[in-house]
C-alpha cells in the first residue's frame, strides 16, 4: 500500500515535539516545526539538531523549523500539538485563524488544564471545533524514540478514519501505533501517570527496594483507574500501553522528567530547585494539585496522590506517602469493575 504523504505541523519544539517531527520526516512527510524563539528555529535549520532538548539527535532535512504559526500551519493536513498544558490554550488561541478546516489535530500533551479541569482534547474542541481531534499517548520517552529504539504508542479518537490516518503516517519499523476509541481514558492515563512518576522518583531517592517500587506502581494503577472510571473512562484502557505501559516507563526510567523531579525532591531539594535543575516542563507537578483537589471533590479514594500533594505543596515528610500506602483502608487487589463503565 502506498503511504499518503502529508504536510504536517508540529506545534512545540520540546523533546517530544522534536521526536514526532523526526519520525514524520523520516517517513517521507513534509514537516514544519513551530518554536517560539526565532534564534532556536534558525539554529535547528542550520545545525539539523535541537541542542536544548535532544542534543545529538540529527533531524532529517524534511524538517523546517519556524517561529511563525502562519507559516507552520499553512497547508497542513495534520497538526501535532506538543505544548505544555499551562500554555496550551494560549497557543490554540494564537493559532486559531491559521488552522485548516478538517485538519487532523493530535494532542501529544500529557497534562490537565487547571481552569475547569479540562483535558487537552477538550480544549481543542473549544478552540478548533472545525478540526478532527485525537490524542497520542503511551510509553514514549523522546530520547529513545529519536534513537529508534522500538516503541509502541496509542492513537485515540472516536473517529476511526483519523486513527487509521495517524497509524499510517507514524508507523515504521521502530514505532508501532495501536488504536483505541476511548480518547478520554487514553488521555487521562497519560496525565495521571505523571503524578506517580514523581512519587516513584522520590521513593528511589530514599532507596526503597524493588518490592516497594512494584507495590507503589501497582497501587498507583489502581488509583488511576478508580479516578478515571469516576470521570467516565473505560477501566480496560488502563491495562494497555497508555495506562500501565506508560506508568511503568515513567516510574522506572531516569529519562522521565517527572521521575527526575521526584528524585531531586527525595534528595531534599526544594520544588523550585528541582524544577530549575530539570530545565524543562514536568507536567506531574501541576497535575498533583489538580487531581488531589478533584479527588476530594468527587470523593475518590487516592491515598498516594493525596499524600504526594501534602508533601510537595505543604512540606510534609516523605514518610507520609509510605504511611498512607501501608495504613490506608483495606481494598481488593484488583479493582477493575467493568460494571462501573458506561460508554
UniProtKB/Swiss-Prot annotation:
A GO cellular component entry from the record: cytosol
Residues engaged in binding sn-glycerol 3-phosphate: 110, 138, 193, 246, 256-258
UniProt keyword annotation of Cytoplasm present: yes
Identification of the protein by name: Glycerol-3-phosphate dehydrogenase [NAD(P)+]
Function summary: Catalyzes the reduction of the glycolytic intermediate dihydroxyacetone phosphate (DHAP) to sn-glycerol 3-phosphate (G3P), the key precursor for phospholipid synthesis.
GO BP terms in the entry: carbohydrate metabolic process; glycerol-3-phosphate biosynthetic process; glycerol-3-phosphate catabolic process; glycerophospholipid biosynthetic process
Source species of the chain: Alcanivorax borkumensis (strain ATCC 700651 / DSM 11573 / NCIMB 13689 / SK2)
EC number, UniProt record: 1.1.1.94
Main location per the UniProt record: cytoplasm
Keywords: Cytoplasm, Lipid biosynthesis, Lipid metabolism, NAD, NADP, Nucleotide-binding, Oxidoreductase, Phospholipid biosynthesis, Phospholipid metabolism
Pathway assigned to this chain's UniProt record: Membrane lipid metabolism; glycerophospholipid metabolism
Family from the record: Belongs to the NAD-dependent glycerol-3-phosphate dehydrogenase family.
GO molecular function: glycerol-3-phosphate dehydrogenase [NAD(P)+] activity; NAD binding
Localisation per UniProt entry: Cytoplasm
Superkingdom per UniProt: Bacteria
Catalytic residues identified in the record: 193
A Pfam entry, by short name: NAD_Gly3P_dh_C
